[in-house]
């Protein structure tokens, strides 16, 4: 064994061994308990960042630990390879998205291997290959036949200059990112999957997810947004159709003083024909894309349509306004406004001088003061005719019943969740497998024409999708009739919604999934990824699993038992102000800093002499130039050091502050372990451990070893507090380094301890542990070695700590044998100098003894 720890030599050698032996390749084995450990697959952007490294290190630690418990562990990896960034990069680098993507995959795959992750590479998937997306296309056609897929018009961002659809991220300050033309909203036909058909089950089954973070479940509950209310129909004077609204507060119905419709509503469109102000307003709304999150804070605007609706219970005429806070794609595109009891309605009514009618009493029974804001709390009705005096629930039921009786209302359960729009007007995605005949009939692509392959050898102009620009690509025949292929591609969330299942059978050619393999491995035991995926990916992931279950492919209801959301990686951020007042962000690697006695940064400059402003720790990002390249750190310290720091610096679900001093500390610790093993093995062969022959000191050290095994096992397995597990191993190492190494049993005990330490560290630092296990004479590869088991007998304490009090005040602590008698404890207490001085010249009047815990001497 060489004296110096040289990670660059060890790590490449061990990685080659894993590759040659195919150590982490697994197959279904009914005789073994399975464990499926999965990290969210990366987008092949070109280089791994520290967020990736953290995510995948957590997964690898869990997978290696479960493997050492004797389980059949599947840990696969792949590439979420479609998406818009590839199109931009292809234009910029004068290439096509496919070669750019495949080059990135090759580079990042090498990076993952360099970090020593124990993946089953035989199951690697790239979602941009026809071998993968063909099954997704086939599944989509089956969903269409089941009535779970439909086409309708929906609004998109449209650049009139480039004549193309823009993704939200391509709209900068309302203008096209390429030509700076003002972007319009345009209605075009798009494909949707009926996720709303599963809304109830998606909501209900959240209760089954005991090992998912509450925050994620709450976000999904709110996103699905189930509510119970009443759908009410209004007649409108001079308008051929009725208006339907939905409300969760029918108790306030007698206070409705206006209706509001979306700018795109047919009523508003009709009214605009004779109303220039309304026409201009509709135009303004059409070209303003409002994210739902911004709806609450934006300025409320509207125009009176001139139409009057008839209140179904009072017969009063109430105005119908077009308003920018009503969206056509939500509900019916019309809402009932009760400004006395809804703050948004109140602000709008106040702005435009509309009637505000209170119908709910304040909590003290008085009429509410509506001079400054609406009363939104529930309460007792007044000003409501026959419903006066009713509290919320009774009023809800009475008004709902009355509306139903008159045939103008019915109780409804509503969802905030909308159907999933899967059409994207991009090139780099899986083609949607639908065709249109010359007579306009829309059909799914016949199975014998699947997959519909996306051509990869294309020229990108940065404006139009190559498959839209080439009229020949769309031409096909179905049943001998000419047809045109759909030129939209799938939302890339489609690919990431079922990849976890395909990992169970990536080579299967008979269908989307081999049910036998899928049901052996599924559900995933632990799924690791960022909380930013809580409502999009993680909802579609759950939805797709239920679709596959209902297609008979899987038997479980949910795709993953446990979800672990790792925290973000933060780093110091610095900038200097440029000549034009702009901020120039400087990498923390290039910042020369001065710190105070507490280690806080007080001054910083860069190599060019710029005084730097330190903004504290923030998420590693390109915009702040504070990302740390994992490759550089691995080359400097080795993969094991980077992995150990990642797992030690912070609990897995909390933010991690990148500190190179901490990385250096992790490196020093690995060197200490190496040094101790080197010194130990250099002394030659070791005798067998004779537990019965150990001295008290040796027994105490062995007790520490086995207590550490018990703690680390619990910390990694049950609690998943990996940082405290590492801290416990470090504490044990400090004791082992001080332990005597001369006697035969000293060395035998150290051998047992070091073999345990190396196995406990193996999930975190697998390369160095692989090597040290061999040096310590461990049987076989450490990858197949069992996890150390704590010896219950070794952990039994033969001494205990007794607190000694004199007249109720603590005067000392003594160590006594577990089976010591009261007399022996009193005698030992008298020998303790801190206690003895309080007993000089006094009489002990009473003794209170709690065996093994407390001795209280009452003196006088």
Curated annotation (Swiss-Prot):
Keywords: Aminoacyl-tRNA synthetase, ATP-binding, Cytoplasm, Ligase, Nucleotide-binding, Protein biosynthesis
Pfam families: Anticodon_1 (PF08264), tRNA-synt_1 (PF00133), tRNA-synt_1_2 (PF13603), tRNA-synt_1g (PF09334)
Organism the protein comes from: Salmonella newport (strain SL254)
PANTHER family named in the record: LEUCINE--TRNA LIGASE, MITOCHONDRIAL, LEUCYL-TRNA SYNTHETASE
Name by which UniProt lists this protein: Leucine--tRNA ligase
Annotated residues for binding of ATP: 622
EC numbers on record: 6.1.1.4
Annotated localization: Cytoplasm
GO molecular function, one term: ATP binding
One GO CC term on file: cytosol
Gene behind the chain: leuS
PROSITE patterns linked: AA_TRNA_LIGASE_I (PS00178)
InterPro entries: aa-tRNA-synth_I_CS (IPR001412), aa-tRNA-synth_Ia (IPR002300), Leu-tRNA-ligase (IPR002302), Leu_tRNA-synth_edit (IPR025709), M/V/L/I-tRNA-synth_anticd-bd (IPR013155), Methionyl/Leucyl_tRNA_Synth (IPR015413), Rossmann-like_a/b/a_fold (IPR014729), tRNAsynth_Ia_anticodon-bd (IPR009080)
Lineage: superkingdom: Bacteria
Keyword Aminoacyl-tRNA synthetase recorded: yes
Family named by the database record: Belongs to the class-I aminoacyl-tRNA synthetase family.
TM helices/strands, residue ranges: none
